[in-house]
Regions:
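Conserved ABC ATPase "signature" region
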Residues: 106-124
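Conserved ABC ATPase signature
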Residues: 128-132, 136
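Conserved ABC transporter NBD signature motif
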Residues: 54-65, 70
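Conserved beta-strand-loop-alpha-helix hinge in the C-terminal portion
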Residues: 204-223
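Helix-to-loop junction immediately C-terminal to a conserved catalytic motif
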Residues: 46
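Catalytic Walker B motif of ABC-type/P-loop ATPase nucleotide-binding domains
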Residues: 153-157
Length: 223
């Protein structure tokens, strides 16, 4: 993934100053203060928004020109699970994502079982999504993306509502995934095994390093 002179303006305010970034690692963490531009960068990477200037290339596609292709190979998990759970019953919701991405119906049940077991949420399969707790919904939203096995997984604070056990489980699960993962989080301990951690501050990259170094610099910047 390549960002070249990429910027993002919103309402004449700069959310992201020009940045050049080549991401080749399988595990990239994004950290930084509230409003520093993490979600903006993640959304640009997933082709959900277009840069105001410069380009973003994902798997050879320009996200401004081929947003559809980029979204096809990308799974995006939002901070707020309600923005991605569509169907009333959990299982139907997971099947919807599979159907939308063209997975044969015969595979649905097995794919859903596998991911739900891995996230230890099999018991939620027949439940109504709106009756679940915030954390349970977050897990279902994550499962909804994982079932489709996207090439690129972008997780924007996917563990904010989870208890310690589930956060760790997600982190272990993510560690075992073969795909490329971009992980936005304020839970710094979830990134200790990551290959690369980028620190944003007021729309600029202030550190880009290994987890220990990047986290230390982030803490210093926040002191
Ligand atoms: N839809 C929007 N319209 C206008 N401004 C926005 C919009 N989304 C984000 N912003 C602004 O862009 C800047 C960067 O926001 P962004 O969501 O990328 O930050 P973040 O680092 O993900 O923050 P947080 O840790 O709070 O989730 C902020 O100043 C924010 O107010």
């Amino acid at each position: 993934m390549t960002f070249s002179g990429t910027t993002l303006e919103r309402n004449r305010k700069t959310a992201l100053y020009p940045l050049d970034l080549e991401l080749t690692e399988r595990r990239v963490g994004l950290i930084g203060a509230n409003g520093s531009g993490k979600s903006t960068l993640a959304r640009l990477a997933g082709g959900l928004i277009r840069p105001s200037g410069g380009t973003v290339q994902v798997a050879g596609y320009d996200t401004a020109k081929d947003a559809k292709e980029v979204r096809r190979i990308t799974g995006f998990v939002f901070q707020n699970p309600d923005s991605q759970i569509v169907y009333p019953v959990v299982e139907e919701d997971l099947a919807f994502g599979l159907k939308e991405r063209g997975f044969p119906k015969a595979e649905h049940a097995e794919r859903i079982s596998r991911v739900m077991e891995r996230l230890r949420i099999s018991h939620l399969r027949g439940r109504l999504a709106h009756e679940l707790s915030g954390g349970e919904r977050q897990l279902v939203a994550l499962a909804g993306v994982l079932v489709t096995e996207p090439d690129l997984l972008i997780l924007d604070e996917p563990t904010t509502l989870l208890d310690l056990r589930h956060s760790r489980q997600i982190s272990e699960h993510v560690a075992a995934l073969p795909q490329t993962v971009i992980f936005v989080t304020h839970q710094l301990e979830l990134l200790t095994e990551f290959e690369r951690v980028i620190v944003l501050d007021q729309g600029r990259i202030i550190a880009d390093s290994d987890p220990d170094d990047a986290i230390a610099r982030y803490k210093k910047a926040m002191a």
